[in-house]
Regions:
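N-terminal helical capping/dimerization or prosegment-like subdomains
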Residues: 1-78, 241-245, 259-262, 336-347
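Metal-dependent amide/peptide-bond hydrolase catalytic core
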Residues: 6, 169, 178-355
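Predominant activation on well-ordered alpha-helical scaffold segments within soluble catalytic domains
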Residues: 16, 36, 109-112, 116, ...
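Active-site metal-binding loops of divalent metal-dependent hydrolases
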Residues: 73, 136, 162, 188, ...
Protein backbone atom coordinates (compact mmCIF):
# COMPACT_ATOMS: atom_id res chain seq x y z
CA UNK A 1 0.00 0.00 0.00
CA UNK A 2 1.49 3.34 -1.00
CA UNK A 3 1.55 6.28 1.37
CA UNK A 4 -0.86 8.76 -0.21
CA UNK A 5 -0.41 11.18 2.68
CA UNK A 6 3.33 11.43 2.04
CA UNK A 7 2.77 12.03 -1.66
CA UNK A 8 0.29 14.78 -0.83
CA UNK A 9 2.44 16.43 1.84
CA UNK A 10 5.53 16.32 -0.37
CA UNK A 11 3.57 17.94 -3.19
CA UNK A 12 2.38 20.80 -0.96
CA UNK A 13 5.88 21.36 0.42
CA UNK A 14 7.37 21.44 -3.07
CA UNK A 15 4.73 23.89 -4.29
CA UNK A 16 5.48 26.23 -1.40
CA UNK A 17 9.16 26.22 -2.36
CA UNK A 18 8.35 26.87 -6.01
CA UNK A 19 6.06 29.78 -5.13
CA UNK A 20 8.87 31.40 -3.13
CA UNK A 21 11.15 31.45 -6.20
CA UNK A 22 10.64 33.94 -9.03
CA UNK A 23 10.23 31.93 -12.22
CA UNK A 24 9.04 34.18 -15.02
CA UNK A 25 9.24 32.63 -18.49
CA UNK A 26 12.89 32.51 -19.66
CA UNK A 27 14.00 33.05 -16.04
CA UNK A 28 12.88 29.77 -14.48
CA UNK A 29 16.31 28.24 -13.83
CA UNK A 30 15.95 28.33 -10.02
CA UNK A 31 12.63 26.45 -10.02
CA UNK A 32 14.22 23.92 -12.39
CA UNK A 33 16.97 23.52 -9.77
CA UNK A 34 14.35 22.94 -7.07
CA UNK A 35 12.49 20.28 -9.07
CA UNK A 36 15.75 18.58 -9.99
CA UNK A 37 16.83 18.49 -6.33
CA UNK A 38 13.41 17.17 -5.28
CA UNK A 39 13.78 14.18 -7.61
CA UNK A 40 17.45 13.51 -6.88
CA UNK A 41 16.79 13.54 -3.12
CA UNK A 42 14.35 10.67 -3.73
CA UNK A 43 16.91 8.73 -5.78
CA UNK A 44 15.03 9.42 -8.97
CA UNK A 45 17.29 9.88 -11.98
CA UNK A 46 16.57 12.89 -14.14
CA UNK A 47 17.97 14.88 -17.04
CA UNK A 48 18.00 18.59 -17.69
CA UNK A 49 17.68 20.34 -21.02
CA UNK A 50 17.80 24.12 -20.54
CA UNK A 51 15.18 24.64 -17.80
CA UNK A 52 13.26 21.46 -18.59
CA UNK A 53 13.51 18.52 -16.18
CA UNK A 54 12.94 15.05 -17.64
CA UNK A 55 12.71 11.72 -15.83
CA UNK A 56 11.89 8.16 -16.93
CA UNK A 57 10.33 5.51 -14.72
CA UNK A 58 12.95 3.18 -13.22
CA UNK A 59 12.02 0.14 -15.31
CA UNK A 60 11.48 1.96 -18.59
CA UNK A 61 11.02 -0.59 -21.38
CA UNK A 62 11.43 0.63 -24.94
CA UNK A 63 9.10 -2.15 -26.12
CA UNK A 64 6.17 -0.70 -24.19
CA UNK A 65 3.98 2.29 -24.98
CA UNK A 66 4.77 5.53 -23.16
CA UNK A 67 2.66 8.07 -21.28
CA UNK A 68 4.02 11.61 -20.86
CA UNK A 69 3.16 13.55 -17.70
CA UNK A 70 3.79 17.22 -18.38
CA UNK A 71 3.25 20.57 -16.73
CA UNK A 72 5.16 23.83 -16.56
CA UNK A 73 6.99 25.64 -13.77
CA UNK A 74 7.29 29.13 -15.27
CA UNK A 75 4.82 31.88 -14.39
CA UNK A 76 3.57 35.20 -15.68
CA UNK A 77 4.58 38.32 -13.79
CA UNK A 78 2.26 39.34 -10.92
CA UNK A 79 -0.24 42.06 -11.76
CA UNK A 80 -0.52 45.33 -9.88
CA UNK A 81 -3.70 44.35 -8.02
CA UNK A 82 -1.97 41.92 -5.67
CA UNK A 83 -2.63 42.61 -1.97
CA UNK A 84 -0.46 39.69 -0.81
CA UNK A 85 3.22 39.02 -1.42
CA UNK A 86 3.09 36.82 -4.55
CA UNK A 87 6.27 35.02 -3.48
CA UNK A 88 5.24 34.26 0.09
CA UNK A 89 3.32 30.95 0.14
CA UNK A 90 0.54 31.54 2.63
CA UNK A 91 -2.11 29.04 3.75
CA UNK A 92 -5.43 30.45 4.96
CA UNK A 93 -8.82 28.74 5.21
CA UNK A 94 -7.65 25.77 3.18
CA UNK A 95 -6.20 27.91 0.38
CA UNK A 96 -2.53 28.11 -0.61
CA UNK A 97 -1.85 31.61 -1.94
CA UNK A 98 1.04 32.58 -4.20
CA UNK A 99 2.02 33.32 -7.79
CA UNK A 100 1.81 30.15 -9.87
CA UNK A 101 -0.04 28.20 -7.18
CA UNK A 102 -2.98 27.59 -9.49
CA UNK A 103 -1.32 28.02 -12.90
CA UNK A 104 0.15 25.55 -13.00
CA UNK A 105 1.93 24.75 -9.74
CA UNK A 106 -0.85 22.62 -8.33
CA UNK A 107 -1.02 20.45 -11.44
CA UNK A 108 2.78 20.27 -11.67
CA UNK A 109 3.40 19.02 -8.13
CA UNK A 110 0.42 16.64 -8.38
CA UNK A 111 1.86 15.09 -11.54
CA UNK A 112 5.31 14.89 -9.95
CA UNK A 113 3.84 13.01 -6.97
CA UNK A 114 1.93 10.76 -9.37
CA UNK A 115 5.19 10.00 -11.20
CA UNK A 116 6.93 9.28 -7.88
CA UNK A 117 4.15 6.80 -7.10
CA UNK A 118 4.75 4.84 -10.31
CA UNK A 119 8.54 5.36 -10.54
CA UNK A 120 9.78 2.16 -8.88
CA UNK A 121 6.95 -0.15 -9.91
CA UNK A 122 7.97 -3.15 -11.99
CA UNK A 123 5.89 -4.83 -14.68
CA UNK A 124 3.91 -1.73 -15.60
CA UNK A 125 1.93 -2.00 -18.81
CA UNK A 126 3.12 1.47 -19.81
CA UNK A 127 6.23 3.58 -19.40
CA UNK A 128 6.04 7.00 -17.78
CA UNK A 129 8.05 10.09 -18.63
CA UNK A 130 7.85 13.17 -16.42
CA UNK A 131 8.53 16.52 -18.10
CA UNK A 132 8.52 19.68 -15.98
CA UNK A 133 8.88 22.27 -18.72
CA UNK A 134 9.72 25.95 -18.94
CA UNK A 135 8.70 28.85 -21.18
CA UNK A 136 5.06 27.71 -21.45
CA UNK A 137 3.54 31.11 -20.66
CA UNK A 138 5.45 32.70 -23.54
CA UNK A 139 5.47 29.73 -25.94
CA UNK A 140 9.25 29.97 -25.89
CA UNK A 141 11.61 28.02 -28.18
CA UNK A 142 13.43 26.26 -25.34
CA UNK A 143 10.39 24.81 -23.60
CA UNK A 144 8.52 21.63 -24.43
CA UNK A 145 8.91 22.22 -28.16
CA UNK A 146 12.67 21.69 -27.86
CA UNK A 147 12.35 18.55 -25.73
CA UNK A 148 9.66 16.48 -27.47
CA UNK A 149 11.86 15.60 -30.51
CA UNK A 150 14.51 14.16 -28.15
CA UNK A 151 12.12 11.81 -26.33
CA UNK A 152 11.10 8.25 -27.24
CA UNK A 153 7.77 7.91 -29.04
CA UNK A 154 4.94 9.24 -26.86
CA UNK A 155 1.62 7.43 -27.18
CA UNK A 156 -0.41 9.58 -24.78
CA UNK A 157 0.26 12.84 -22.95
CA UNK A 158 -1.43 14.26 -19.89
CA UNK A 159 -0.84 18.00 -19.75
CA UNK A 160 -1.31 19.42 -16.27
CA UNK A 161 -3.26 22.66 -16.18
CA UNK A 162 -6.04 23.89 -13.84
CA UNK A 163 -9.22 22.21 -15.12
CA UNK A 164 -11.01 21.43 -11.81
CA UNK A 165 -9.94 17.83 -12.59
CA UNK A 166 -12.34 17.78 -15.50
CA UNK A 167 -10.78 16.46 -18.68
CA UNK A 168 -10.29 18.82 -21.60
CA UNK A 169 -10.60 16.62 -24.67
CA UNK A 170 -10.18 19.62 -26.97
CA UNK A 171 -8.68 23.09 -26.71
CA UNK A 172 -8.76 26.16 -28.88
CA UNK A 173 -5.79 27.23 -30.93
CA UNK A 174 -4.20 30.67 -30.65
CA UNK A 175 -2.96 33.31 -33.05
CA UNK A 176 -1.55 36.61 -31.86
CA UNK A 177 -1.57 39.25 -34.60
CA UNK A 178 0.27 42.56 -34.71
CA UNK A 179 -1.86 45.05 -36.63
CA UNK A 180 -0.30 48.23 -38.03
CA UNK A 181 -2.64 51.02 -39.13
CA UNK A 182 -0.85 53.60 -41.26
CA UNK A 183 -1.85 57.26 -41.38
CA UNK A 184 -0.35 60.70 -41.85
CA UNK A 185 1.63 62.43 -39.14
CA UNK A 186 0.86 66.11 -38.57
CA UNK A 187 0.56 68.89 -36.02
CA UNK A 188 -2.64 68.45 -34.00
CA UNK A 189 -3.70 72.03 -34.86
CA UNK A 190 -3.87 71.33 -38.61
CA UNK A 191 -6.57 69.45 -40.57
CA UNK A 192 -5.79 65.76 -41.08
CA UNK A 193 -8.19 63.36 -42.79
CA UNK A 194 -5.79 60.44 -42.41
CA UNK A 195 -5.44 60.24 -38.63
CA UNK A 196 -4.47 56.60 -37.91
CA UNK A 197 -6.09 56.71 -34.46
CA UNK A 198 -9.52 57.36 -36.01
CA UNK A 199 -8.82 54.64 -38.57
CA UNK A 200 -7.87 52.29 -35.73
CA UNK A 201 -11.13 53.06 -33.92
CA UNK A 202 -13.11 52.07 -37.02
CA UNK A 203 -10.99 48.94 -37.41
CA UNK A 204 -11.60 47.89 -33.80
CA UNK A 205 -15.33 48.27 -34.39
CA UNK A 206 -15.06 46.04 -37.47
CA UNK A 207 -13.14 43.43 -35.46
CA UNK A 208 -15.76 43.46 -32.71
CA UNK A 209 -18.41 42.54 -35.28
CA UNK A 210 -16.55 39.75 -37.06
CA UNK A 211 -18.25 36.37 -36.71
CA UNK A 212 -16.83 33.21 -38.21
CA UNK A 213 -19.60 30.99 -39.50
CA UNK A 214 -18.47 27.56 -38.30
CA UNK A 215 -19.27 26.82 -34.66
CA UNK A 216 -17.83 23.85 -32.79
CA UNK A 217 -19.93 21.69 -30.48
CA UNK A 218 -16.94 21.35 -28.13
CA UNK A 219 -15.15 24.68 -28.54
CA UNK A 220 -17.85 27.14 -29.56
CA UNK A 221 -17.09 30.16 -31.74
CA UNK A 222 -13.81 31.64 -32.90
CA UNK A 223 -13.13 34.55 -30.51
CA UNK A 224 -11.33 37.77 -31.47
CA UNK A 225 -10.12 40.22 -28.81
CA UNK A 226 -8.08 43.40 -29.17
CA UNK A 227 -5.78 43.33 -26.14
CA UNK A 228 -3.26 46.14 -26.71
CA UNK A 229 -3.10 49.51 -28.45
CA UNK A 230 -0.12 51.81 -28.82
CA UNK A 231 0.19 55.16 -30.58
CA UNK A 232 1.60 58.65 -30.22
CA UNK A 233 4.33 60.24 -28.13
CA UNK A 234 2.98 63.70 -27.28
CA UNK A 235 -0.30 65.60 -27.13
CA UNK A 236 0.15 67.89 -30.14
CA UNK A 237 1.38 65.38 -32.72
CA UNK A 238 -0.84 63.07 -34.76
CA UNK A 239 1.16 59.84 -35.06
CA UNK A 240 1.98 58.20 -38.36
CA UNK A 241 0.73 54.80 -37.26
CA UNK A 242 -1.14 52.87 -34.59
CA UNK A 243 -0.20 49.40 -33.39
CA UNK A 244 -2.80 46.93 -32.14
CA UNK A 245 -2.45 43.41 -30.77
CA UNK A 246 -5.24 41.02 -31.69
CA UNK A 247 -5.72 37.77 -29.76
CA UNK A 248 -7.66 35.11 -31.71
CA UNK A 249 -8.85 31.83 -30.16
CA UNK A 250 -9.55 29.33 -32.91
CA UNK A 251 -11.98 26.41 -32.74
CA UNK A 252 -11.47 23.01 -34.36
CA UNK A 253 -13.42 23.98 -37.49
CA UNK A 254 -10.61 26.20 -38.80
CA UNK A 255 -6.87 26.03 -39.14
CA UNK A 256 -4.89 29.06 -38.03
CA UNK A 257 -3.85 29.67 -41.62
CA UNK A 258 -7.51 29.79 -42.71
CA UNK A 259 -8.25 32.41 -40.04
CA UNK A 260 -5.26 34.47 -41.19
CA UNK A 261 -6.40 34.35 -44.81
CA UNK A 262 -9.95 35.41 -43.90
CA UNK A 263 -8.79 38.34 -41.75
CA UNK A 264 -6.53 39.62 -44.52
CA UNK A 265 -9.65 40.00 -46.67
CA UNK A 266 -11.60 42.15 -44.20
CA UNK A 267 -9.00 44.17 -42.25
CA UNK A 268 -7.59 47.21 -44.03
CA UNK A 269 -4.21 47.28 -42.32
CA UNK A 270 -0.92 45.46 -42.16
CA UNK A 271 -1.57 42.16 -40.34
CA UNK A 272 1.36 40.12 -39.03
CA UNK A 273 0.87 36.76 -37.28
CA UNK A 274 3.45 36.01 -34.61
CA UNK A 275 2.93 32.26 -34.98
CA UNK A 276 0.56 30.10 -37.01
CA UNK A 277 1.60 26.78 -35.46
CA UNK A 278 -0.57 26.80 -32.31
CA UNK A 279 -3.63 25.15 -33.83
CA UNK A 280 -6.56 23.71 -31.92
CA UNK A 281 -6.17 20.15 -30.66
CA UNK A 282 -8.51 17.33 -29.72
CA UNK A 283 -8.63 13.63 -28.87
CA UNK A 284 -11.21 11.14 -30.08
CA UNK A 285 -14.14 10.70 -27.72
CA UNK A 286 -13.65 6.95 -28.27
CA UNK A 287 -10.03 6.99 -27.07
CA UNK A 288 -9.33 4.55 -24.23
CA UNK A 289 -8.25 7.34 -21.83
CA UNK A 290 -11.56 9.14 -22.43
CA UNK A 291 -13.55 5.96 -21.86
CA UNK A 292 -11.60 5.23 -18.67
CA UNK A 293 -12.26 8.78 -17.48
CA UNK A 294 -15.98 8.45 -18.12
CA UNK A 295 -16.04 5.13 -16.25
CA UNK A 296 -14.50 6.92 -13.25
CA UNK A 297 -17.06 9.75 -13.54
CA UNK A 298 -14.66 12.43 -14.80
CA UNK A 299 -16.39 15.21 -16.72
CA UNK A 300 -15.15 16.12 -20.20
CA UNK A 301 -15.25 19.49 -21.96
CA UNK A 302 -13.65 21.72 -24.58
CA UNK A 303 -11.17 24.28 -23.24
CA UNK A 304 -11.00 27.89 -24.49
CA UNK A 305 -7.42 28.31 -23.24
CA UNK A 306 -4.17 27.23 -24.88
CA UNK A 307 -1.58 24.96 -23.28
CA UNK A 308 1.48 22.99 -24.33
CA UNK A 309 -0.95 20.50 -25.87
CA UNK A 310 -0.61 22.60 -29.01
CA UNK A 311 3.05 21.60 -29.25
CA UNK A 312 2.44 17.86 -28.81
CA UNK A 313 1.56 15.82 -31.90
CA UNK A 314 0.44 12.67 -30.07
CA UNK A 315 -2.96 12.06 -28.45
CA UNK A 316 -3.31 14.18 -25.32
CA UNK A 317 -5.69 15.42 -22.66
CA UNK A 318 -5.50 18.44 -20.38
CA UNK A 319 -6.23 17.69 -16.74
CA UNK A 320 -5.29 19.15 -13.38
CA UNK A 321 -6.34 20.58 -10.02
CA UNK A 322 -7.22 24.25 -9.73
CA UNK A 323 -9.54 26.52 -11.68
CA UNK A 324 -8.58 28.23 -14.92
CA UNK A 325 -10.61 31.28 -13.86
CA UNK A 326 -8.03 31.94 -11.11
CA UNK A 327 -5.08 31.91 -13.50
CA UNK A 328 -3.21 35.21 -13.88
CA UNK A 329 -5.43 36.87 -11.24
CA UNK A 330 -4.31 38.90 -8.23
CA UNK A 331 -3.81 36.89 -5.02
CA UNK A 332 -3.81 33.65 -6.98
CA UNK A 333 -4.55 30.53 -4.93
CA UNK A 334 -5.34 26.85 -5.01
CA UNK A 335 -7.21 24.81 -2.42
CA UNK A 336 -5.04 22.29 -0.58
CA UNK A 337 -7.80 19.72 -1.04
CA UNK A 338 -7.69 20.27 -4.80
CA UNK A 339 -4.08 19.09 -4.85
CA UNK A 340 -4.75 16.17 -2.49
CA UNK A 341 -7.70 14.99 -4.57
CA UNK A 342 -5.84 15.68 -7.80
CA UNK A 343 -3.07 13.24 -6.90
CA UNK A 344 -5.62 10.56 -6.01
CA UNK A 345 -7.52 11.07 -9.26
CA UNK A 346 -4.41 11.10 -11.47
CA UNK A 347 -3.29 7.79 -9.93
CA UNK A 348 -6.73 6.23 -10.18
CA UNK A 349 -7.13 7.24 -13.83
CA UNK A 350 -3.70 5.94 -14.81
CA UNK A 351 -4.23 2.68 -12.94
CA UNK A 352 -7.54 2.18 -14.74
CA UNK A 353 -5.92 3.03 -18.09
CA UNK A 354 -3.03 0.63 -17.44
CA UNK A 355 -5.17 -2.43 -16.70
Amino acid sequence: MFDINKLQNDAIDLLKKLISIKSFSFEEDKTADEIENFLISRRIKCERKANNIISYNKFFDKNKKTILLNSHHDTVEPNSAYTLDPYNPTVSKGKLFGLGSNDAGGALVSLISTFVHFYEKENLNYNFILLASGEEERSGPNGIKSVIPTLPKIDLAIVGEPTLMDIAIAEKGLIVFDLIIKGTSSHAAHPNKNNPIYKAAKLINIISNINFEKKSDLLGDVKLTVTQINAGIQHNVVPSDVNLVLDVRVNDKYSNKEIFNELKKVLDCQIIPRNLELNSSSISTDHRIVNCAKKLKFKTYGSPTLSDQAKISCDSIKLGPGDSLRSHTADEFIFIDEINNGIKKYIKLLEEYSL
